[in-house]
Regions:
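Feature captures hydrophobic
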Residues: 1-108
Length: 108
């Protein structure tokens, strides 16, 4: 079962989606904990966004962090810095696409 507060945060992001920030389909895999409800696939395209629990397809960008840190990032109470990546609080395979995710939802 999905983490209810995490699921609510992700559903809230859909209303903040800015399609003009995306020029092609980009698939993100969010690994936000160890429980099945902490893992999500987010697909963004110029025509919309979708979010489904679990891993679906091959992601262009993977973000691994805690659900708490992700929710704080979304609500603006946390601003990541380079040290957070060096310490492993946030892990990604593509920083540029991660920044594009933030822009697509008006985060930060």
């Amino acid at each position: 079962m999905a983490n209810p507060s995490l699921q609510q945060v992700l559903e809230g992001l859909q209303g903040r989606f800015r399609p003009e920030a995306i020029d092609r389909e980009i698939i993100y895999y969010l690994s936000l904990g160890e429980a099945p409800g902490d893992k999500w696939t987010v697909t963004l395209s110029p025509s919309g966004c979708s979010m489904v629990p679990g891993r679906v397809g091959t992601a262009h960008c993977v973000l691994k962090t805690s659900a708490d840190l992700f929710m704080r990032l979304v609500d603006g109470t946390y601003q990541p810095n380079a040290l957070d990546f060096m310490r492993g609080k946030l892990k990604t395979n593509d920083l540029d696409l991660l920044l594009r995710l933030r822009k697509a939802f008006g985060i930060g």
